[in-house]
């Protein structure tokens, strides 16, 4: 059984909120709420790629800097970035200066444009991979799933980079493709209700 922690407001939250004070707001207003906006979906999968090998606290602290540096994750604009932009970004101390991850985000922006042409939207594509709830029987006990493995494989086949199964699973958790809030977390039933009323794209 996954654990919860009781915050200063008396609410039970997922235990990972205890790792940093800024996590409470992120947990309460973003994590796990279903997202069908293409730009937000693209931003999140890029930031999950940047997180690889690092903590989410590091990425969250730099998120506004990332948005400023990466054209607010408008993938149509980011797809036009060139080698000069890569070199500029490598000098930006406000972000994670990792050439491979920077180049992957630009590459993925181009692949996102292609995906919209083929699929209609990023949301229509990603939500096709919404798993059956039974796949995650006990919340927060897995770092990958059969669906995250399948989605990762398909993205790589389409030319996306830094989209391994663990990265993709974290993306699915955060974007509400699954409800992975802990049993006992005050938000778990709310997320269930939001997911029930969500009109799936595509």
Over which residues does each language-model region extend?
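HhH-family (HhH-GPD) DNA N-glycosylase catalytic core used in base-excision repair
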Residues: 1-202
């Amino acid at each position: 059984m996954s654990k919860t922690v009781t915050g200063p407001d008396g609410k039970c939250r997922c235990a990972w909120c205890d790792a940093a004070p800024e996590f409470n707001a992120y947990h309460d207003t973003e994590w796990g709420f279903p997202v069908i906006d293409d730009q937000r979906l693209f931003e999140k999968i890029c930031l999950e790629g940047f997180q690889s090998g690092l903590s989410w606290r590091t990425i969250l602290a730099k998120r506004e800097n990332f948005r400023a540096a990466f054209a607010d994750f408008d993938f149509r604009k980011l797809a036009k970035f060139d080698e000069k932009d890569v070199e500029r970004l490598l000098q930006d101390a406000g972000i994670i200066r990792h050439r491979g991850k920077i180049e992957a985000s630009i590459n993925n922006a181009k692949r996102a444009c292609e995906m919209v042409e083929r699929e209609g939207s990023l949301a229509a594509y990603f939500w096709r991979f919404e798993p059956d709830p039974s796949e995650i029987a006990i919340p927060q006990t897995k770092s990958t799933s059969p669906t995250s493995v399948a989605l990762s494989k398909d993205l790589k086949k389409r030319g996306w980079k830094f989209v391994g199964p663990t990265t993709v699973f974290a993306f699915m958790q955060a974007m509400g493709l699954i409800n992975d809030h802990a049993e006992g977390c005050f938000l778990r039933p709310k997320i269930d209700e939001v997911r029930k009323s969500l009109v799936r794209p595509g």
